[in-house]
A protein has these predicted regions:
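Conserved beta-strand positions in the central sheet of alpha/beta enzyme cores
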Residues: 34-36, 76, 161, 228, ...
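Catalytic domains of carbohydrate-active enzymes, especially glycoside hydrolases
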Residues: 55-75, 121, 313-338
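Aromatic-lined substrate-binding rim segments of carbohydrate-active enzymes
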Residues: 89-92, 100, 105-115, 318-319, ...
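Alpha-helical scaffolding within the catalytic cores
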Residues: 80-83, 106-110, 137-153, 172-174, ...
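N-terminal pre-catalytic segment of deacetylase/amide-hydrolase enzymes
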Residues: 3, 25-95, 261-264, 268-288
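Bacterial N-terminal signal peptides that target proteins for export
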Residues: 2-13
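Metal-dependent polysaccharide deacetylase catalytic core of the NodB/CE4 family, i.e.
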Residues: 30, 35, 40-41, 93-95, ...
Length: 343
């Protein structure tokens, strides 16, 4: 198990499982929803089982049509910001559309649909990927070029957001060499056997926020106003750093509705598994049958072993069991009791 090990795998697994159980009905009066998509594939293609983030173009258009027929109002980032400043009010059933990673499919498949339905949307760019540099989490899919980015931005329909420059990856976060989300992890220096200090961490986060914003301005002439956190991971320090760099709105990946009072951490509902219009309607209306929380208690002592390789095997085994048992909530016993006496 290489990238993100227990932390990343548990977070990702529980996120996708809990996504299935959420009820998303909401009222208006300053509330809004946000949907999150990634890559969009051709109508004749079948979403591969290993890529849960792909959505078929005809399903996407079906979802756009459903939103219009059911009274949802797709709004822009500017409309949300104006409402937050008291310059206007949000319409009933306001909703943001967001697309992560800057894939070419946004230009070739999504953008024509936005123009057809007059829907605004936000697209989040990963600077290092746009720069042509390969990273551990680079999906290897075609991306938009800068001319296309400028074109969609100039249309008036698309908000260009930062998805960081180089934080869409993992960094070493412990002596075992496990990598974790760069935004929220204190870097572990293996040769020196130390973690970065709070001051070093803050400096790294701040530098990344400014670099990502400056990179987009350099190539597109746009100062991004929105930071979209890779993997949905953020904290108060990263939010403050993004704000310093001019990105007053940031977005994560937690289900639920939003209020104008909390634009520093906008909740977004990720659309996975190419749900089809029936499941999409259930997601949007919250009419699904209430499902129980399935809980597991995990004792960290049973994961740890003096042999690092055995620890890795233990982690892999428990993550697989959590998936197989459809567990959506895990309580960690995050303290050591090696002699088993309860103290």
């Amino acid at each position: 198990m290489k990238l993100f090990t227990l932390s990343k795998k548990l977070t990702s697994l529980l996120f996708v499982l809990s996504f299935s159980f959420s009820s998303l009905a909401y009222s208006s009066n300053g509330h809004f929803l946000a949907l999150n998509y990634h890559d969009i594939i051709d109508e004749e293609d079948v979403v591969p089982p290993f890529d849960r983030m792909e959505v078929n173009k005809h399903f996407l258009e079906d979802e756009f049509v459903w939103l219009k027929k059911n009274g949802y109002n797709v709004v822009s980032v500017q409309a949300v910001l104006d409402a937050a400043e008291g310059k206007s009010t949000l319409p009933d059933k306001a909703i943001l559309l967001t697309f992560d990673d800057g894939y070419l499919s946004f230009y070739t498949k999504v953008f024509p649909l936005l123009k057809k339905y007059h829907y605004p949307a936000t697209v989040a760019l990963v600077g290092k990927w746009m720069d042509g540099q390969v990273t551990a989490d680079d999906p290897g899919k075609p991306l938009m070029n800068w001319a296309q980015v400028r074109e969609v931005a100039q249309s008036g329909l698309v908000e260009i957001a930062s998805h960081t420059y180089d934080f869409h990856t993992g960094i070493v976060g412990n002596p075992q060499g496990n990598t974790q989300a760069a935004t929220v992890t204190r870097l572990y220096d293996d040769p020196m056997l130390v973690y970065e200090t709070e001051e070093q961490y803050h400096a790294r986060i701040r530098a990344e926020m400014f670099k990502s914003a400056d990179f987009i301005f350099q190539h597109a002439g746009i100062h991004p106003r929105v930071m979209v956190w890779p993997y949905g991971e953020y904290n108060e320090m990263s939010i403050a750093a993004a704000r310093e760099a001019g990105m007053m709105m940031t977005m994560g990946l937690i289900d639920g509705s939003n209020t104008l009072a909390n634009l520093s951490a906008v909740r977004r509902m990720i659309i996975v598994d190419d749900p089809g219009i029936k499941k999409f309607a259930e997601i949007m209306t919250g009419l699904r049958v209430e499902q129980n929380v399935r809980v597991a208690h995990l004792d960290m002592d049973y994961l740890y072993d003096k042999d690092p390789e055995q620890t890795e095997k233990n982690i892999s085994s428990v993550v697989q069991r959590i998936k197989d048992m459809h567990i959506n909530t895990v309580y960690l016993q995050a303290y050591a009791d090696p002699d088993g006496d309860g103290n």
